[in-house]
Amino acid sequence: PGGERYEDATSEIARRVDEGALIVNYIGHGGERGWAHERILNLETINAWTNLRRLPVFMTATCELFRYDDPDIYSAGEAILFNPQGGGVALLTTTRTVYSSGNQQVNRAFFETALDDTQGRRLGDIYRDTKNSEQITSHTNSRNFSLMGDPALELAYPAKHVYFTEVPDTMRSLDEVVIRGYVGNAKGDVLSEFDGVVVPTVFDKRASVTTLD
């Protein structure tokens, strides 16, 4: 089909999935066949994923991505879960039409529940607490979200954390800088027995970007 495409967005999604993102999140227009009118994610892209050892959890607040009860349609959500070479380990996603205001509530409640620094939380617990969140006022909308996957699975939270104790406030191109810190547990205690390599990622300053309508 014709229409504008965002090929860079499609490539970036595939790269993040392949690298093993913990959670892949999308909120916006979509349907049974994928995300967005520009088809930034579709069945062809999903079926090409080969991230079998690095399966993320998908949180998608978009219409009917996993309409599993229509035998005539193989939905994008089903393709993500059942891709034999990759895809996702589970999805908190939609089986029917949903609406933007309610989607934002569910999306925010999910992340506040999933990333509350509580180790060992199962997907079923996260799903339950998300659906019961006081933030959600549109319960008709939230009932169209379902957990597709094993509710006993835990998110792959890192057991070790990197804590910085000294970071320069300014970094310029080609500068040599010294950053100090330590590897610790979730409580901030130093893990003196740690023996490994820490790979830093440096981000540029925030920038505003305008995309096509």
Predicted regions and their residues:
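Cysteine-dependent hydrolase recognition
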Residues: 1-213
